[in-house]
Amino acid sequence: MSRSNRQKEYKCGDLVFAKMKGYPHWPARIDEMPEAAVKSTANKYQVFFFGTHETAFLGPKDLFPYEESKEKFGKPNKRKGFSEGLWEIENNPTVKASGYQSSQKKSCVEEPEPEPEATEGDGDKKGNAEGSSDEEGKLVIDEPTKEKNEKGALKRRAGDLLEDSPKRPKEAEDLEGEEKEGATLEGERPLPVEAEKNSTPSEPGSGRGPPQEEEEEEEEEEAAKEDAEAPGLRDHESL
């Protein structure tokens, strides 16, 4: 009987019991074989397991026709997904897993239990999420760089303003000093005018100088008279 199983050929959609190492004969369906995997999996069929929605590549020796082996292998089993698989093969034999890809490769010898397709889908999503997080990280790194550049530009502008600010007060001081000098010159200019007014004679045509000069001349005349009288007095006293 096993010899006939090895020689039996299955086609897509055939319902079988598939035997994997470490697992009971499981309700399954012969699925499509991808063209890319035909050479590497010669004489092996891609099998879809009901209940678990996993896939594997198995040879004819590990496959048994469902109708012929239902009484032998279709007994209830405590393994998770087995009862669901028996229900699906009877009521929904065309079921497919969400995100199922027929190109996935599984081997009963290499893998004790085929992994569900959903796991691979989750891995892809996770990879995409990691990729997006990397992009976000780049953006976050770029933003501080831009902020640093902007801050550097602001610092440079502030430094230029500080350098210009001491020059401006100095220029303002120079302007103020010039204005003060101009004011002092203007304040000194009226003094000669006043001196000219004081030097003018009190009465026009009198020919006399200022009152102070007249007083000095009178004092000098009196002193000369006293000196002239002084010898006469001395001679009289000597007599």
From Swiss-Prot:
Localization terms from the record? Nucleus; Cytoplasm; Secreted, Extracellular exosome
Where does the record place the modification N6-acetyllysine?
44
Residue positions where Phosphoserine is found in the record? 132-133, 165, 199, 202, 206, 238
For the motif Nuclear localization signal, give the residue ranges: 75-80
Q: Compositional bias (Basic and acidic residues) at which positions?
A: 135-172, 180-197, 225-239
Q: Which InterPro entries match?
A: PWWP_dom
The Phosphothreonine modification is found at: 184, 200
Protein residues bound to heparin: 19, 21, 72, 75, 79-80
GO annotation, cellular component aspect: cytoplasm; extracellular space; nucleus
Region entry Disordered, spans:
69-239
Q: Which GO biological process categories is it annotated with?
A: chromatin remodeling; positive regulation of cell division
- Spell out the disulfide connections: 12-108
Which GO terms of the molecular function aspect are on file? DNA binding; growth factor activity; heparin binding; nucleotide binding
> Could you describe the post-translational modifications of this protein?
Sumoylated with SUMO1. Sumoylation prevents binding to chromatin.
Q: Ranges of Polar residues compositional bias?
A: 91-106
One Pfam family from the UniProt entry?
PWWP
Residue ranges with Acidic residues bias: 110-121, 212-224
Q: Which UniProt keywords apply?
A: Acetylation, Cytoplasm, Disulfide bond, DNA-binding, Growth factor, Heparin-binding, Isopeptide bond, Nucleotide-binding, Nucleus, Phosphoprotein, Repressor, Secreted, Transcription, Transcription regulation, Ubl conjugation
Q: Where is this motif: Bipartite nuclear localization signal?
A: 155-170
Stretches assigned to the PWWP domain: 12-69
* Spans traversing the lipid bilayer: none
Q: What does this protein do?
A: Acts as a transcriptional repressor. Has mitogenic activity for fibroblasts. Heparin-binding protein.
Task: Tell me the protein family, please.
Answer: Belongs to the HDGF family.
Relay the domain remarks.
Answer: The PWWP domain harbors the heparin-binding sites and is responsible for DNA-binding, while the C-terminal region is essentially unstructured. The N-terminal region does not contain a typical signal sequence but is required for secretion. It also determines exosomal location.
- What this protein is called in its record is Hepatoma-derived growth factor
Organism, as annotated: Bos taurus (Bovine)
